[in-house]
């Protein structure tokens, strides 16, 4: 089954930017585009506006206008639209589950808006079973020009980042872009090592060679699967969020992972993804992984 790329529309400038980003990505990947608008009836004092059918018509007209702006630029793109009356989070999560990715709009720095206002957005990102991409209102196609990289974070063992790396390499292959794979590392507490083990580490050149070996191992299968995608291995000491943000200016897209499991307090986005979402200027993809 071919999964579409789905854009969530709410009438804001941010969601229109997300719609056009999703359309360009669908063209690159040869996938259909689905546009979903969630609608809630809002009673007004005016008699005609109080009619649910009237309001639904307004929503449909706005959706059709937005889609026309897409098909004018991409006349061969297969586009489907849905106006759904229902609960926003559940509707978006259901749409994401059937999609290659869900694309939503967000403001630049600071709190996310539109679909991503407060708890709604946090819940969609935290619970989606497919990648969610957030696009800034000011994002333009020029930002995807040659020279800009797909930046992805890699942590832990090779299997820990497999889904995140797959998304990054597939995206870079579709765009003809370079992948910059960032692995951040920190010094462990000294008390975790005996003097003898520290001596052996010093003889081996310190901890960095071990981190470099782990990064190379994680990338090996993806280099083999995507031999035409240029790769930059970026190894740097520091917190993962800070290191990723330090190279955000190079990125046409940043890709971060999120553990797809629930804790005692519910699903969580994670501190690294949360920091990148709020402070990176480029579009950000959050990819769930085991």
State where each predicted segment sits:
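Protein-protein interaction modules outside structured cores
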Residues: 209, 232-246, 250-290
């Amino acid at each position: 089954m071919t999964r579409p790329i789905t854009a969530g529309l709410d009438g804001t400038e941010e969601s229109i930017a997300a719609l056009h980003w999703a359309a360009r990505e669908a063209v690159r990947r040869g996938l259909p585009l689905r546009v979903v608008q969630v609608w809630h009836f809002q009673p007004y004092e005016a008699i005609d506006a109080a009619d649910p059918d009237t309001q639904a018509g307004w929503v449909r007209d706005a959706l059709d206008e937005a889609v026309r702006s897409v098909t004018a630029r991409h006349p061969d793109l297969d586009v489907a639209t849905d106006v759904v009356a229902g609960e926003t989070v559940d509707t978006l999560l259901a749409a994401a589950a059937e999609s290659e990715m869900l694309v939503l709009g967000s403001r630049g720095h600071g709190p996310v808006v539109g679909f991503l206002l407060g708890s709604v957005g946090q819940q969609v990102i935290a619970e989606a079973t497919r990648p969610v991409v957030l696009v800034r209102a000011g994002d333009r196609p020029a930002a995807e020009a040659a020279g800009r990289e797909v930046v992805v974070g890699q942590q832990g063992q090779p299997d820990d980042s497999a889904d995140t790396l797959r998304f990054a390499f597939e995206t870079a292959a579709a765009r003809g872009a370079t992948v910059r794979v960032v692995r951040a590392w920190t010094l462990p507490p000294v008390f975790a090592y005996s003097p003898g083990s520290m001596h052996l580490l010093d003889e081996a050149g310190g901890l960095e060679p071990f981190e470099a070996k782990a990064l190379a191992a994680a990338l090996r299968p993806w280099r083999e699967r995507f031999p035409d995608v240029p790769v930059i291995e970026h190894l740097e000491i520091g917190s993962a969020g800070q290191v990723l943000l330090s190279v955000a200016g190079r990125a046409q897209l940043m890709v971060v992972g999120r553990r797809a499991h629930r804790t005692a307090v519910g699903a969580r986005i994670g501190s690294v993804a949360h920091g990148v979402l709020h402070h990176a200027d480029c579009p950000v993809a959050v990819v769930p992984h085991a």
